UniProtKB/Swiss-Prot annotation:
The protein's Enzyme Commission number: 3.2.2.23, 4.2.99.18
Annotated family: Belongs to the FPG family.
Lineage, top ranks: Bacteria, Pseudomonadati, Pseudomonadota, Gammaproteobacteria, Enterobacterales
Gene that encodes the chain: mutM
Entry protein name: Formamidopyrimidine-DNA glycosylase
Catalytic activity: Hydrolysis of DNA containing ring-opened 7-methylguanine residues, releasing 2,6-diamino-4-hydroxy-5-(N-methyl)formamidopyrimidine; 2'-deoxyribonucleotide-(2'-deoxyribose 5'-phosphate)-2'-deoxyribonucleotide-DNA = a 3'-end 2'-deoxyribonucleotide-(2,3-dehydro-2,3-deoxyribose 5'-phosphate)-DNA + a 5'-end 5'-phospho-2'-deoxyribonucleoside-DNA + H(+)
Xref: HAMAP family: Fapy_DNA_glycosyl (MF_00103)
Active site positions: 2 (schiff-base intermediate with dna), 3 (proton donor), 57 (proton donor), 259 (proton donor)
Length: 269
């Protein structure tokens, strides 16, 4: 599933081609995504794009009359193409732009979303979200406070959007390795110093992935059609049985709430 770095990479890739241009019309080939494509998107016409923003894993296209909210789901990606290129099997939505470009949404598993909001404030998919991990609001003191009475393992707690947004399976595993914290540790057992370290490495891991264009494991592509290159730097995720790059101990894989967790028994305590 595309996580925060992949969504931010998509935002940065499409923004220069959309902001200042006008959506002439939308082409919806298959509106049966995780939620049905909003009716307002079918009717888009002559709408200039004012900004391209991100909240958590949602892309937000600001138009004069409202917002397009896009979620990439499990396998979605956005590409900027030249108008006239024929669609392929899993190309479900196009935004045809006034500058001769097309924003094309591809999603083999159709678990993404294209929604419309007159106002963002209070929209159900954006309500109750925690802070952005790259913001000043997410820090060691905040994390320690939220972990203090939490009798659950730290790994799934990091992936809870009420705590912090956008830290999915890949980056939770990688951040815990970088901090030397075992994913099964109770959140309440973390000291303030450990929370401060963990908050710092989460930011560092996410920023490094954004620099590398995100992580491509299967479906994700950047807006120019290229894969994300952070997969080449993964320390534990997807490396079951391979030697730890630090100590040589074989990487272990377990399941947490049906999600794979990867860690080093020697480096993480």
């Amino acid at each position: 599933m595309p996580e925060l770095p992949e969504v931010e990479t998509s935002r940065r890739g499409i923004e220069p081609h959309l902001v200042g241009a006008t959506i002439l019309h939308a082409v919806v080939r298959n509106g049966r995504l995780r939620w049905p494509v909003s009716e307002e998107i079918y009717r888009l016409s002559d709408q200039p794009v004012l900004s391209v923003q991100r909240r958590a894993k949602y892309l937000l296209l600001e138009l004069p009359e409202g917002w397009i909210i896009i979620h990439l789901g499990m396998s979605g990606s956005l590409r900027i193409l030249t108008e006239g290129l024929p669609p392929e099997k899993h190309d479900h939505v196009d935004l045809v732009m006034s500058n001769g470009k097309v924003l094309r949404y591809t999603d083999p598993r159709r678990f993404g979303a294209w929604l419309w909001a007159k106002e963002l404030e209070g929209h159900n998919v954006l309500a109750h979200l925690g802070p952005e991990p790259l913001s000043d609001d997410f820090n060691g003191e905040y994390l320690h406070q939220k972990c203090a009475k939490k009798k659950t393992a730290i790994k799934p707690w990091l992936m809870d959007n009420k705590l912090v947004v956008g830290v999915g399976n890949i980056y939770a595993s990688e951040s815990l390795f970088a901090a030397g914290i075992h994913p099964d540790r109770l959140a309440s057992s973390l000291s303030l110093a450990e929370c401060e370290l963990l908050a710092r490495v989460i930011k560092a891991v996410l920023l490094r992935s954004i620099e590398q264009g995100g992580t491509t494991l299967k479906d994700f592509l950047q807006s120019d059609g290229k894969p994300g290159y952070f997969a080449q730097e993964l320390q534990v995720y997807g490396r079951k049985g391979e030697p730890c790059r630090v100590c040589g101990t074989p990487i272990v894989a377990t399941k947490h709430a049906q999600r794979a967790t990867f860690y080093c028994r020697q480096c993480q305590k």
